[in-house]
Design a protein with these regions (language model features):
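Glycine-rich adenosine-cofactor-binding loop
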Residues: 16, 107, 126-146, 157
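Active-site glycine-rich loop that binds ribose-phosphate moieties when present
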Residues: 112-117, 136-143, 172
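NAD(P)-binding Rossmann-fold cofactor-contacting core
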Residues: 150-173
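Residues at the starts of beta-strands that form the adenosine-phosphate
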Residues: 11, 128, 151-152
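Phosphate/diphosphate ligand-binding glycine-rich loop within oxidoreductases
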Residues: 4-120
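Short, flexible coil/linker segments at domain boundaries that flank nucleotide/cofactor-interacting
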Residues: 7, 123-124, 148
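Conserved small/polar residues in nucleotide/adenosyl-binding loops
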Residues: 190-194
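Short acidic low-complexity segments
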Residues: 175-189
Length: 194
């Protein structure tokens, strides 16, 4: 069935650079068609220095929202009217929701992870959590676990480009959720004996 776009069609997008390889437009547009939703999803190649303009255009065109990918996640967070609790701690976003001109930035990786655990009968409240890695998704998972009541989070990461960020994330969580014990360890310092 051919997609008909009208003056009532809601617009959603992906912003970042590069985005030409993204499968998101095909995935979302297929889903909208199957669900009978009057939306269209496109990808805009937006370099970091144009994020402010892109977000202003989002309001101007009354776009319902967008996904944000690298390298725009930190820059986009600066122009939100509101940030979710996890996005406040991390200082980056991957989703923008436009609610009548009010833009709220979210970081959804951790929310999705914790929601999936709950769907499988696992409640993290009061639990000890171990996370391997300190990249973007791992950071979001650590933060969301702390926000959702994990008692202790231990992060293991090799001393690479993400390690300093791993230590910073641990400190941010300690400040935002002081009841959660946060530990970060350099994997290169851990020796396993046989």
């Amino acid at each position: 069935m051919e997609k008909r776009i009208s003056g009532h069609t809601g617009l959603l997008a992906l912003i970042g650079s590069p985005v030409g390889h993204s499968g998101s437009p095909a995935m979302y547009n297929y889903s909208f068609e199957k669900l009978g939703l009057d939306y269209a999803y496109v990808a805009f190649d937006i370099k970091e220095d144009k994020v402010k303009d892109a977000i202003a255009a989002m309001k101007t065109f009354n776009m319902r929202g967008c996904n944000v990918t690298m390298p725009d996640k930190v820059e986009a967070a600066k122009y939100m009217d509101e940030l979710s609790p996890a996005a406040q701690i991390i200082g980056a976003i991957n989703t923008i929701v436009n609610d009548n001109g009010k833009l709220t930035g979210h970081i959804t990786d951790g929310e999705g992870f914790v929601h999936n655990l709950k769907d499988h009968g696992i409640d993290i409240k009061g639990k000890k959590i171990t996370v391997a890695g300190g990249g973007g998704a791992a950071t979001a998972i650590q933060v969301q676990c702390a926000l959702d009541g994990a008692r202790e989070i231990t992060i293991f990461n090799k001393n690479d480009a993400f390690f300093e960020r791993t230590l910073q994330t641990a400190e941010k969580i300690k400040k935002a959720v002081p009841e959660c014990v946060e530990n970060a360890y350099d994997l290169s310092l851990i020796h396993i004996s046989e």
